[in-house]
Amino acid sequence: MRRLLFATLLFPVAAAAQDHSMHDMPAQPAPAPQEAPVDHSMHDMPAQPAPAPQEAAMDHSMHDMAAMPGMGANAVGGSGSALLPAAEGAMRGFHATTTGNWMLMAHGVLTGVYTDQGGPRGDDMAVVQSMAMLSASRPIAEYARIEFRAMLSLEPAMGRRGYPNLFATGETANGRPLVDRQHPHDLFMELSARADVDIAPGTSLFLYGGPVAEPALGPSAFMHRRSARYLPLSPIGHHWFDSTHITYGVVTAGAKTDAFQFEGSAFKGREPDEARWNIDTPRLDSWSVRATWTPSPHWTAQISHGRLKEPEVQHPGEDEARTTASLHYARGGLSAMLGFSAKNRLPGDTLTAWVGEANWDLSRHHSLFGRIENVANDELFPDHADPLHDRLFRITRFEAGYAHRIPLGKAAELALGGSLAAYAKPAALDAAYGKAPISGTLFARLALGQ
């Protein structure tokens, strides 16, 4: 009963909760010399005294970030409250443990990209993609934990129109729909908090959210999936699967066991506006539910459904019912995902999309990766005077590439690589896109802790 009550009062009592962390256990005295056996086991080494408070020493190390609170043995945290197979390995980052039992973590990615998108509607451009993530977590009781997280990007500097990405659509720039382009991420990608309370062995409740967060809808966002680690451009099905990964206003409550997670969210349905440097007004006008199954450290499956209030500014008055399902696999150096999504415009048509992607680390220095997408899209011709306006076309995109990885000590990695993309499309699009457009992309990716 005490734990259930604690779960409902978690945030107000956090500051006053007693910390039963192992870090605060007194050091055990070493055995007397005459009794000490000749044993070099690590278990029998005398405990080191804690640093004096006045030293305020910080333990800096590079290692896997501990799984997010309550993840269990079979899963690690993806974006938001999404789960990924534990065999993918937790996110790596720079850690500092303070004397107050706070675990601080920093992670970042900076990618220089040059892409040449083929065909008459293609374009070429050099851009810099970026993401920096900071988190602070600690136990607040013997059976409760709390985490604060911030994620930032300087991509708004590339301009409102983002970068060329053939057959990608979604959002607007300067009042016009973006077509064959990917919009930049906002400066504030996440400003959130999460609290977990254990209510029974292997079972916990959690509360997650913030002014910028991700609701329980869809798989983990593409930039957080190991299967998409070296793919230089966003999926053209981004607005089917994970466009809600930057949402202004999210509250999620859930329950987690070793094998299952069930959660529900209230959030703002409208996608971010064109002003990428600020924080949009949060609102809770939409909802979603998600169930995730983690039967082993190698498999994760999720199914989710949400009702979004007017998500796209170019479709005023249209709500959306979105349903997604995905299966994730990881073993050794292989990470893969297969996903399906259906977005039903209310009123309007139901548009479906499929995605399959994989990354295979052949060795310490060599990786192969690829993605296949099939998307039904009716936004390729936004001009009302165009005879193809509002026509539905099903596009298949094939992309494959190679990355050469250069470890930079334990702290960072530089990856140099590139990819080629080809497309299958209806003949009615030949005049606009050419018969067989080919796109090529080169990248240099510097990652802190990954």
Where are these regions (language model features)?
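Outer-membrane beta-barrel "beta-signal"
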Residues: 400, 406, 434-450
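Repeated loop/turn-to-beta-strand initiation elements of outer-membrane beta-barrel proteins
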Residues: 104, 142-146, 201-205, 259-263, ...
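Surface-exposed coil loops of outer-membrane beta-barrel proteins
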Residues: 159-292
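Outer membrane beta-barrel transmembrane domains
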Residues: 304-314, 335-348, 352-359, 365-409, ...
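Residues that define the transmembrane beta-barrel architecture of outer-membrane proteins
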Residues: 102, 124-132, 185-191, 245-251, ...
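Transmembrane beta-strands of outer-membrane beta-barrel pores
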Residues: 110-118, 152-158, 211-215, 257-259, ...
